[in-house]
Amino acid sequence: MSRYKVYVIPAAWKEIKELPGRVRQRVRKAIEAFAEDPRPAKSKAIEVQGLIPEVRRLRLERWRIVYAITDADALVDVLAIRKRPPYDYGDLEALLKDYPSK
């Protein structure tokens, strides 16, 4: 398996910095692991019609890491770190506005 480049968008970095210490460490380790395996067993695909990258989420306790995988470029973009509940992926369209359509 090839190694993926992991990019965390600036807004997601800000969210990571605001997390409680224990959660922040778990989130950072999970993000680093995306370089070797961007589709860990506990991650789930998020259905987004007409979008080129595959959008997934990884659950860590009550937190979600929302990210996009572009296999052609071996790239993982971390888009958001959100607490659930109340997060319901309502801003997913805004997070993905810069990605090309199929």
Regions found by a protein language model. Name each.
Residues 1-30:
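Arg/Lys-rich, positively charged N-terminal/basic patches that mediate binding to nucleic acids
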Residues 5-6, 56-58, 85:
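Residues that recognize and position ribonucleotide moieties
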Residues 11, 53, 83:
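Residues that form or immediately flank small-molecule/cofactor binding pockets and catalytic motifs
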Residues 14, 33, 83-86:
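Active-site micro-motifs of SAM-dependent methyltransferase domains
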Residues 16-18, 56-59, 68-70:
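Short histidine-centered beta-strand/loop micro-motifs
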Residues 32-58:
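A short, surface-exposed loop/turn module that caps and links secondary-structure elements
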